[in-house]
């Protein structure tokens, strides 16, 4: 009897001694001791929040549309073009795989000798020209009249042998003259460009995008990107086409502007037959 009572007492003592460790959360008080120091682990460097103000802005390179290509039909047929009067594009990158393989096959057989000229690379310093590259010297003031004289002069020149600094300056001239056009006339400028170069409508989007981005270009960033990413031959073709058409198409389409400026046209002058005919046609359209 006493032995069973002692055994029951010892089991109760073991149970009571084990009870505080069953649930440790019970022993924690809800009220925090004010004298207790809160020792938290310091945040790692990856957890520290940095204000967005100090994040450096990412500046990606400008995406330039592909240059319009008018591939030489002789080259597309697999023959090397040896004509000195052909003004089409002769870049082999413009050919598809079939046309390129056909050209290689004919070339390796020795049927046609190559007379193609390899264009020299552009001076990439001129993508962002400095004052030394375009020193003004004693040049006249750049008025609208001077811009037109420069455009008329270079519209009739062959640009294939021109030096890089002048070609870069002509690209700037095209950008400046493009901004003299009304934004509504950029579509007409694109259509005239396609007709002048004999390009298909599949090239219209690229040409129109170039004119639109030159028109809204701030700081010459897109102009510099064109110089960097287009090859020399594409730049020459684009500049030549622009200089030939820019002085021939209207720069304004607003009927109010056109009718208002038409009244300011000088009176008929019979000094030369060409001027007289031009005045006659103008006056007839105005009336």
UniProtKB/Swiss-Prot annotation:
Residues 24-34 have a biased composition (Polar residues). InterPro entries: VP30_FiloV. GO terms for biological process: symbiont-mediated suppression of host innate immune response. The keyword Ligase does not apply. Pfam families: Transcript_VP30 (PF11507). One of its GO terms (cellular component) is host cell cytoplasm. A zinc finger (C3H1-type) spans 72-90. Gene3D superfamilies: 1.20.120.1160. Residues 26-40 are annotated as: RNA-binding. One of its GO terms (molecular function) is RNA binding. The keyword Protein biosynthesis does not apply. It is found in: Virion; Host cytoplasm. Residues 1-52, 268-287 are annotated as: Disordered. Residues 180-197 are annotated as: Interaction with the nucleoprotein. Keywords: Activator, Host cytoplasm, Host-virus interaction, Inhibition of host innate immune response by virus, Metal-binding, Phosphoprotein, RNA-binding, Suppressor of RNA silencing, Transcription, Viral immunoevasion, Viral nucleoprotein, Virion, Zinc, Zinc-finger. Phosphorylated by host. Phosphorylation negatively regulates the transcription activation. Phosphorylation and dephosphorylation take place in viral inclusion bodies and are largely influenced by the presence of NP. Dephosphorylated by host PPP2R5C; this dephosphorylation enhances viral transcription and is mediated by NP. Residues 94-112 are annotated as: Oligomerization. Homohexamer; hexamerization is essential for RNA binding. Interacts with the nucleoprotein/NP; this interaction plays both essential and inhibitory roles in viral RNA synthesis. Interacts with VP35. Interacts with host STAU1. Interacts (via C-terminus) with host RBBP6 isoform 1. Interacts with host DICER1; this interaction prevents TARBP2/TRBP binding to DICER1 and thus allows the virus to counteract host RNA silencing. Multifunctional protein that acts as a viral transcriptional activator. Promotes read-through of an RNA hairpin in the NP open reading frame to enhance viral transcription. Mechanistically, nonphosphorylated VP30 hexamers form a ternary complex with the viral leader RNA. Clamps the RNA template and the complex VP35-polymerase L together, thereby increasing the polymerase affinity for the RNA template to increase transcription initiation despite the presence of RNA secondary structures. Also assists stop-start transcription at gene junctions to promote transcription of downstream genes. Belongs to the filoviridae transcriptional activator VP30 family. This is Transcriptional activator VP30. It comes from Reston ebolavirus (strain Reston-89).
């Amino acid at each position: 009897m006493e032995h069973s009572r002692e055994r029951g007492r010892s089991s109760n003592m073991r149970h009571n001694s084990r009870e505080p460790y069953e649930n440790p959360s019970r022993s924690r008080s809800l009220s925090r001791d004010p004298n207790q120091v809160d020792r938290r682990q310091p945040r790692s460097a990856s957890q520290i929040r940095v204000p967005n103000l100090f994040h450096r802005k990412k500046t990606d390179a400008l995406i330039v549309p592909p240059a319009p290509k008018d591939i030489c039909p002789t080259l597309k047929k697999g023959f090397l073009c040896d004509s000195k009067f052909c003004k089409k594009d002769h870049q082999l990158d413009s050919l598809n795989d079939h046309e390129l393989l056909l050209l290689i096959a004919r070339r390796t057989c020795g049927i046609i000798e190559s007379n193609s000229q390899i264009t020299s690379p552009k001076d990439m310093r001129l993508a962002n020209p400095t004052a030394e590259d375009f020193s003004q010297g004693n040049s006249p003031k750049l008025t609208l009249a001077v811009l037109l004289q420069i455009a008329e002069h270079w519209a009739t020149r062959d640009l294939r042998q021109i030096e890089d600094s002048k070609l870069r300056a002509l690209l700037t001239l095209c950008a400046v003259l493009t901004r003299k056009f009304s934004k509504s006339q950029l579509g007409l400028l694109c259509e005239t460009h396609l007709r002048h170069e004999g390009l298909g409508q599949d090239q219209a989007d690229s040409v129109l995008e170039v004119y639109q981005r030159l028109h809204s270009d701030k700081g010459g960033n897109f102009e510099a990107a064109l110089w960097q990413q287009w090859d020399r031959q594409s730049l020459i073709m684009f500049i030549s086409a622009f200089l030939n058409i820019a002085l021939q198409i209207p720069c304004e389409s607003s009927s109010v502007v056109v009718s208002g400026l038409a009244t300011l046209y000088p009176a008929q002058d019979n000094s030369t037959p060409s001027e007289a005919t031009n005045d006659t046609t103008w006056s007839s359209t105005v009336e």
